[in-house]
Amino acid sequence: MRISLLLFCIFSLFSSLSRGSSIPFSPIVRSYSVSDYNAGIQNWSITQDDRGVMYIGNNKGLLEFDGNNWELHELPSKNIVRSVYIGKDGKIFVGSFEEFGYFERNSLDSLVYHSLKDEAKDFRFHNDEIWTITSAHGEIVFQSFGSLFFYDGHTVKGIRTKTLPLNLFQVGDTVYSQQINGGLFILAK
């Protein structure tokens, strides 16, 4: 009887201790509903700046989340933001339907949008939706399914591609393009 009581006490002690401990390798998950961030139901792209602030391309615009507060930054056209990329200079580049540019903080620490679309001289937009943004060879690259746009910090050059880029992937300093009905290509200067 004493042994049974001792075993029962030991078992009870260990089981109560194990309930209070966390499960190893179990990620902490926090869900955010549409009512938390007060924007569209679809999120298309996510990136994070060097301060830890998250930027999310959303149906209603660019969402900014500092870990506590959400803020929506709409494009002048109020279009969906499909792609988001943060440049080395801290600019937040965004892509949308026949629109692309960047948000930059002003002297009041508010985000202000600067369109780059009209900087693409001699380029006619035709259903160009910017799906991916990355950097290559010192330029920001905006990718739609029929065009690539290169921004060097001053000018924008738009080109129609012979093969249609489905997506861009960056590995180190090399940018790869998966082509629609094609193979994998390397974006060269």
Give names to the regions the model predicted:
Residues 1-189:
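Carboxylate-rich, polar loop motifs that coordinate divalent cations or form catalytic acidic clusters
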